[in-house]
């Protein structure tokens, strides 16, 4: 049923309450993860979840006060900005996955994923925030509102383009990895050969699902804004709940187990600098096409971290794949 307010409907109480509860739980889990891991990258999805929580709090207020224009404006800005932090987290996590499994399977250098895609995310964020502010502060049906909507649409289209390109590169990497067909030629330097485990596979699958959810949400937002403020999509709450709320709560939850490769990589006895600049001696079993053996990594640890627990006291002892 159409309602003559900024939304075009009255937000459902139960949906907004459910969203606030679920994003509150997600926020608590992300904060707990930060306290447990003490890794700065966990802060990024926390900011995104705070944004989602703020946006749905505004929608909850609007469910009781449907004519409150400030609530409408607040939810527009918050729910447009928040997903940018989720996508930024995905780019950073993929950077760590590439370093963990081998840059030779990636189209781009690992450091470029964060640099290029986060820069694009910032551009999309600025466009969407600026457009949302202009459109939200303008009179309904005015030319200024139309201009603001067009700016927002440009920002969300750019964000969709960015995440689709990222998804393609993401897919290419894992296809090359699982088929053992390196994309980039070997430079002669050795890279870590990390075996697959159920936990590693689950973590990568969670990141893939989170990325897909963000693509779905972006496609919906493009269609919504392309139709305008009085279009059939934006004035029907059910589409917003299905294609924005559900993808974003799943994304927030899925980014938690997706942290595993980044946390695991920090335990390996070498850093990105060592991977990119050091030559490693082959193991007693000879060189491997896909990277060093466990003995190679053990030998590296003794050189790089001679005083750490990673360097075995017995030179004949090597690490098992589970210890890595």
Swiss-Prot record:
GO (cellular component) term, any one: cytoplasm
Keyword Membrane: yes
Transmembrane segments: 14-34, 40-60, 72-92, 115-135, 156-176, 206-223, 238-258
Compartment list: Membrane
UniProt superkingdom: Eukaryota
GO BP annotation list: phospholipid translocation
Coiled-coil ranges from the UniProt annotation: none
GO molecular function, one term: ATP hydrolysis activity
InterPro entries according to UniProt: RTA1
Record keywords, A-Z: Membrane, Transmembrane, Transmembrane helix
Main subcellular location of this protein, as a coarse class: membrane
Membrane topology label: Multi-pass membrane protein
UniProt keyword Transmembrane helix, yes or no: yes
Name this polypeptide is given: Uncharacterized protein C17G6.02c
Organism in which the protein naturally occurs: Schizosaccharomyces pombe (strain 972 / ATCC 24843) (Fission yeast)
């Amino acid at each position: 049923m159409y309602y003559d307010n900024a939304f075009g409907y009255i937000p459902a109480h139960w949906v907004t309450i459910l969203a606030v509860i679920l994003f509150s739980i997600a926020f608590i889990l992300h904060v707990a993860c930060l306290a447990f891991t003490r890794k700065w990258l966990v802060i990024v999805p926390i900011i995104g979840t705070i944004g989602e929580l703020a946006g749905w709090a505004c929608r909850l207020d609007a469910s009781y006060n449907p004519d409150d224009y400030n609530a409408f404006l607040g939810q527009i800005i918050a729910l447009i900005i928040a997903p940018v932090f989720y996508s930024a987290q995905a780019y950073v996590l993929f950077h760590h996955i590439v370093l963990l499994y081998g840059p030779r399977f990636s189209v781009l250098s690992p450091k470029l994923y964060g640099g290029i895609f986060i820069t694009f995310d910032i551009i999309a964020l600025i466009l969407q925030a600026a457009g949302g502010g202009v459109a939200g502060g303008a009179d309904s049906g005015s030319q200024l509102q139309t201009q603001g909507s067009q700016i927002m649409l440009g920002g969300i289209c750019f964000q969709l383009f960015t995440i689709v390109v990222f998804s393609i590169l993401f897919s290419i990497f894992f296809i090359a990895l699982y088929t053992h067909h390196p994309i980039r030629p070997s430079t002669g330097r050795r890279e870590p050969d990390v075996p697959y485990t159920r936990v590693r596979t689950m973590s990568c699958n969670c990141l893939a699902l989170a990325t897909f959810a963000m693509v779905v949400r972006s496609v919906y937002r493009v269609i919504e804004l392309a139709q305008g403020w009085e279009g059939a999509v934006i004035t029907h709450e059910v589409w917003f709940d299905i294609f924005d709320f559900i993808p974003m709560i799943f994304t927030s939850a899925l980014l938690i187990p997706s942290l595993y490769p980044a946390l695991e990589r920090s335990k390996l006895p070498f850093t990105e600098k060592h991977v990119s600049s050091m030559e490693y001696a082959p193991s007693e079993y000879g060189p491997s096409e896909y990277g060093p053996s466990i003995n190679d990594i053990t030998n590296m640890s003794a050189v790089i971290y001679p005083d750490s627990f990673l360097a075995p006291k017995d030179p004949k002892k090597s690490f098992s794949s589970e210890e890595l």
